[in-house]
Amino acid sequence: MDVVKSLAERFSAPLKENYKRRIIFWHDPDREFEQTIDEIAIPNVKVLKLTGSNNFYAKMLLSETDIENNYLVYNPISYQDVKDNWLLDIECYSEEFRADMLSIRMAEYNMPNNSAMRKALKLYNKFFENKERAGKLASLHSDYTSAGQLHIDIIAVLSGTSMNTASGVIRALLLNGLNYDENPAVKNIQKFGNEDIMWELINRYTGFERTEGATFDGLAAHILLTALSVTMSKSSLAGLEKLISEPHSSLCYALVNEWMHSDFDDELYDIARVVEDKLHLATRFDKIEVAELLNGECFPCINECIIRRFMTEISENIIKVEDIVRATNTRRTMKWYKRVRHYYDGLLQVANMQKFNRDHIAGFHIAEHSKLFKAYCDEYYKMDTYYRQFHSALGKSLKESSTVLEDLYKNVADYVENLYTNWYLNTLGSQWNKLTFDEFQKDSELVDIPQQNRFYNNQISPLLQNNGRVYVIISDALRYEVAAELCDLLVAETKGTAKLSAMQSMFPSATPYGMAALLPHKQITLDENLKVLCDGMSTDGTVAREKVLKTVGSGNVAITYKELLAMKQTERREKVADAQVVYIYHNTIDNVGENRPTEDQVFEACEDAISEIKNLIRVITNDLSGTNILITADHGFLYSYKPLEEKDKADKSFVSGEVHELDRRYIICDDECRAEHMIRIPMSNMNTTLVGYAPLENIRIKKSGGSMNYVHGGISLQECVVPVIKFKNMRSSNKKFVDVRKAELQLLSQSRKVSNSIFTLDFYQKEAAQGKVTAATYDIFMSDATGKAVSDTQTIIADKTDSDAMARTFHTRFTLKSAEFKKTESYFLNILEKGTTNIVAREEFSIDIAFINDFDF
């Protein structure tokens, strides 16, 4: 206690001339130290406590009994008449000490000793009776230039928060519960703080009036709606004016924004849900135009209203492509987006599909099969990707079920199914069948299209001429559109180069035929047991395929993905030490798709396959120092989400003659066989007199067992266009090496002066995010010279792929926090890579606004 130190210094000071001892009278008329005086111990000093009934004893002690020792005389008694003071004569030659508790507390907390601070401190005597509370106050290390900060700190301690700002304590009060009577923070304030001060702070910061029956759920509604008024028009909030304080809008917006980016965002979500349910905000927002809702961030139901609107319209065959894209791009950087991101992802894919439909509404009228094949590889495949990504999003949303939106999402899936299956697959398939009908009846290998049957000679042999090792990853059912996504990721995420091309698969587009075609051979043969041979050798299984590989190189290796990953690094290196060619067999997609119980997870398996192949490439390049890697597949696949209608199924009765093999998408039979509504395809390229039949377009052949929605074996572009990715790992010393870099963001606005608490700035993405330039996410905020944030934080995702520079701009709104800004000081706009402290750009600004923290009360 500082008072003990002060007294000790007084007693240790030199005595006046002719004085042999020191007597100090401590007057404490308010009895602030009455309970602690007995704890005071000062070396060589005795303590005498006056009680009002020991006056005679005290007088005798100090004047007769003990005239040698130093004495501290504690006197809590007030005398109406000095004549009542028995020790007045002794006081006249003694010293006086006064130390009221307020002064001591002010000194202890480095507070200015002025009337305003003394008045504030007097409100909290009960607070300071507890050492733990007093210690927590000290731990805040506040600079008490005003009584307002003391009030805030007291509320912070009693609310259980270290956020000792006006917004921080208001947030803490609400986090303690919306039931005012049961709120533990309020109960603490009522006992040890000052409830009136708490309400005055709330009113000054938020504009919320303390009226009879005022509650914290009302306060929460007021804060959230006042914050929302910053981003929504008055007309949209008509009827809610009593819950909004326009002069406090920027302060409430800053409070909510700060809360959103804190560790208590889940609690804010729950509070916002309570408010929107109580005020029926979803019903209100359902009637407002989507454009008006786009920037509203406070309430989760806004996302649901936007999504519901679009999904309802889609179910009614109204698809606003540009509006959906704009909404998704706007909402994705907002707080509650992640909770509904799969719904937005699904909507975006619907918009992509609709745009594709709009661009090709006249159909796919290309006159030559080779040109249609190329058009599919260049552009048409994207529709397959959109469909896959839609259903991936749908599947993920069902795992995070929202009863509000789930049924609508399924209605949208019906629309998507109709667009994809009935328009795209049937229209594209019909044109492909039309162009290839006669060609296929001549030969299963179409002219002017690269053939899977010559993969080894065309792709591997040229790479071996440089005496390098070639790794070949064969991923079962890695269809072209999935490989296209993989190729883009390899370019963007690795130091290597990746180029995608395509070839026509063997017919049937099934594993035994495709796997054989990818091996080195002079002749593929289909024997009497329907086994596919390469130059008379079996190709069934990894062991058999390795034997075929060894015919062109004794050290060549065939191994499965799982076997390779299970090996240690030294084992991997030993395995391929003598190999010129290494075939690695990967089977994730087909393994899932071929099984009826799991076929509906095939699109999820596609995502897994992409991740696994990327990992496999890291193993090859890092552990095995591989440079040349080819990624291909045995075949593609067709998949439709909805069960097919009877009209899309063909019965075996359509076939006359002896059938040797029948699957959903092909038949192998004797030459004499005939099949209605199918394309006859000779199989002479496998040295057999047997022939095949393939159903038209999207039709499946009925059979028992196996998958129905996931199929392959036929001649649709989705099945027979087989990808070839040529990946070359590049070292930084290579002249052709191009490193991956993130798309940069640059401030476009010319002015460097802020003159309003809410202001907007324009930013520019310097390059299109494609190839080796990858998308990047940035956090942007204003700070003072010390780096302390003085504004909210906004996020920009720099992933625009437009070649037009003007299409790569961002218009972003910021809100300053409650603070005093000096126009003579420098402030800085900071652009950081999200999730890091890496500042990629910093621009100096001045702030000139009349915006002073006025919470000194």
Describe each PLM feature range:
Residues 473:
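Beta1/beta-strand and adjacent pyrophosphate-binding region of the FAD-binding site
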